[in-house]
């Protein structure tokens, strides 16, 4: 039988969606626990509500179909995007309706940013600080104003339109989440098409994303910011679309615009160097990176990503194949190499998520450090409270993501790992070497902990004995960070040598000039000495202990000498049953639980170090004749080399603002400081307590209720060991972060 060309074409067409996959049922959604036969029966004990929360998003426990799990995750992503767009819309609406953005634009150095006014109900109006420009409101430290300035937003009307756009996008995302689960749900092979996904994400999301941002900066943000920097009033600047459609207007600011696209197609790209620059350093007017450098950077990235997005083999017979790349990746000591990893990454979303969380967490920490060393937005560097907030925010986000990576890595090991499919590949070989890896890492932690704290204890002892000449310090026994200083110097010398076209250093943290804006220091060389060497070894210690706990949780997720059948017990279990003492707190969940405490330790030391170092050695004022006055007078080098110095000259000294905030516009921080301490202390009640104590207490209370014929229909139960730890951990972190937030902001707002 001859096949027609139409039939042949239809056979080649791949159908990647299933129509009307799941009916839309409000009645089903209204039933709590509809996803579980057990939970749908309703509560018999108070444990039901805990299980409801634990399992609502644990799609693995609701179905064994990988396709169904994939669809639920995909749909949930649209819901997440809807919330993000709604949040962004709300931020812009606040900027449009409640803020002093227009006033701030006219004088961003002396006017503080505010986008919320508290109503006077019972005296709360005390929180409305005088932020300058005839405006009273809560001082905000989010960095939105600086970002809006960099985008070229000059009026509240533009913020309104952006807010409406965000609202519309939020609605579209909600619709898309419903549509792609109920009406046109992708099939499993669509989710597993790694090459197509890589091409679209690289060329589409990253490539076109960078290109559109670069285009916006060139055509809208650059001309508007150039006029603002020159002192032109925001009201007198043409509307954004005029720069877009009027080439003559652009040519007045950037002459190369008059030449059109001829230099581009002629390969004479240097003609565009008036708006695509490679200056390096910071704009002396705003203290931020040159926006023309940023536009150039994103244009270059877009080219790289668009090329990268054509790298993988899809419908045509050219390009890379992910499975082939992985299976060809073999070294002399790595057995089968990456064989089997392709199957893992296309069937286990926990494995995929683990890698993504680890990468995104690391990226967030990198962003935190770049935000102060290379401030990207105008007038960000001189807004010290915002700088401290952004650093702290990105460090916490990074810490949580990295721990999340370990959590999902362990879940993958328990639920998705198949030993038979991973014989002698890299993953199998790491698992077989786990005792060597963990014991060596443990030795490193002991070494770092003993030596790092030993330095401090030595210094505290010598200072107490009145022997400063025997201390580790820049003035006595020096421990100079010579490698860090060498790296700083390499970067300082790069312009004109290894970076021949750069006009200034990448960051003035490495050395060079003092950049000041309106008499406030934006950035200056950050000198590193003995104090930094010592605290960096505390960083190394806390980070290595966090990694030790998390890595042990992943490598011993399926089995250990103590519990050989751990994989059968699952990701989360309290102990290995009755009659096996000493097996509690050995599940992968418990490793994540312990790892979060050490993550909290790690990040706390980092943000304390940053806050004090910047106040001591960078932030401050400079007079016209060049005399510099730092906020804490350069006391970091001599005070931070003892534990007593950290307690007295940082924690106690800088807590004065939050402790004495009552009766001022910062009084909310005083209350948060107090309240967050209570939340933190409340956590200890769960962390230092046994379940049996509470069960006995509950039973005596239930007895009293029964005596009065007032017994509840839902039987009260004490929290399980795991639930108690989860509640304790949540309050410990919330209380600790809330306390730090209040301490930092009350201090930072007073010095900004």
Swiss-Prot record:
EC class: oxidoreductase
Record's subcellular location: Plastid, Chloroplast thylakoid membrane
GO cellular component terms attached to this protein's record: chloroplast thylakoid membrane; photosystem I
Cofactor binding: number and manner: P700 is a chlorophyll a/chlorophyll a' dimer, A0 is one or more chlorophyll a, A1 is one or both phylloquinones and FX is a shared 4Fe-4S iron-sulfur center.
Binding site for [4Fe-4S] cluster: 575, 584
Coiled-coil zones: none
Segments passing through the bilayer: 73-96, 159-182, 198-222, 294-312, 349-372, 388-414, 436-458, 533-551, 591-612, 666-688, 726-746
Summary of the function given for this chain in its UniProt record: PsaA and PsaB bind P700, the primary electron donor of photosystem I (PSI), as well as the electron acceptors A0, A1 and FX. PSI is a plastocyanin/cytochrome c6-ferredoxin oxidoreductase, converting photonic excitation into a charge separation, which transfers an electron from the donor P700 chlorophyll pair to the spectroscopically characterized acceptors A0, A1, FX, FA and FB in turn. Oxidized P700 is reduced on the lumenal side of the thylakoid membrane by plastocyanin or cytochrome c6.
Protein name in UniProt: Photosystem I P700 chlorophyll a apoprotein A1
Classification lineage: Eukaryota, Sar, Stramenopiles, Ochrophyta, Bacillariophyta
